[in-house]
Amino acid sequence: MHHFSSRSAVMEAVVGYLHVRRLNEYRQLMSDIDSPDQMLTRAAIRTSVETAWKYVNLPSFIAYQELLGAARTDPALASAVDEVERDFEREFLKTVRAVFPHWKQVKSLKAAHELVQFVMQGMGVAHRSPQREQRARRVIDTVTDYLETIYLADTAS
């Protein structure tokens, strides 16, 4: 800690580091799923949902969730997290548009993104749930169904 002026400076550095790392990990994981020169298939949609599940099981995601929990009772940490959360949300949605070209013009893109994000985050923090992987597969199937429905409804001509 001797490299930092205070505990809050350490926490701000950790939050900032995880912010950049999480965005980069997401970009790397999702970058080759949706090819703009091919038709979007259910398999590609499912792969994106499965990859989102992998993402919320990465050590960086888990560490960040711990910080979010701690920020509930630590005002200085909450301040650092709030700032990063706003930026993360903007950057995350930009990344979604960049790595999923078929979804760029989908009217319900934000709703689809939020569905995946909140469901996967919820499953991610339920790491002690019995039969976690079997339950995750069922939820992945359901989320894939919804995303396919949203995509087909919003792109039907």
Residue ranges and their predicted role:
Residues V10, D87-E91, V119:
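A short structural micro-motif
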Residues A13-G16, V20, N24-P59, A112-V116:
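Hydrophobic alpha-helical connector segments
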Residues A78, D82, V99-S157:
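Hydrophobic/aromatic-rich alpha-helical bundle segments in the mid-to-C-terminal region
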Residues L23, R27, K54-Q65, P75-H102, ...:
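Amphipathic alpha-helical packing segments from all-alpha helical-bundle domains
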Residues M1-V14:
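Helix-turn-helix
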Residues R72:
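Acidic, metal/ion-handling microdomains and their immediate structural contexts
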